Amino acid sequence: HDRSALWAEIQRCGVKTFGEPQADNFRWPLNRSEAKARLDEFITHVLPQFGNWQDAMHTEEPFLFHSLISFALNTKMLNPREVVAAAQQAWRLGHAPLPAVEGFIRQILGWREYVRGIYWSQMPGYRELNALDQHAPLPDWFWTGKTQMRCLAHAVGQSLTEAYAHHI
């Protein structure tokens, strides 16, 4: 996919970013058909193993058994209902085992949608909550990934280079 026009517009508008954004590293769908294709690819090729490997991480494989559909969900190119229905259909047709489908649906409904619902039901006051009474700024490594804690260096570094570091 040629993302050069989008990238030129981002640069022209002076969109502030952190990390290492690059036009050829922008792998997210730009329209519904691309988002649907990403979902279909996950359901067909990855979902059958999702139950066993949904929490796996590897320093050389940033995406592993993840669906890579969060961007499409967040930008409304996909909706959670159709994502769940696609996973259910894979199980009904015998293309994915129940533990994999259950694990994926739990990530969508039991985590993503639940947390999103709590967040928006409590806004705008939720933004100001500080239950731990924390006032210190985030450490520099949060923005650079430069820390001796290997797991955090990898997770933050991956976020900076891939704009991705989570399940969905």
Model-derived features with residue positions:
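Specificity-determining recognition surfaces
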Residues: 1-63
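Gly/Thr-rich phosphate-binding loop signature of adenosyl cofactor/nucleotide-binding cores
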Residues: 37-40, 44-167
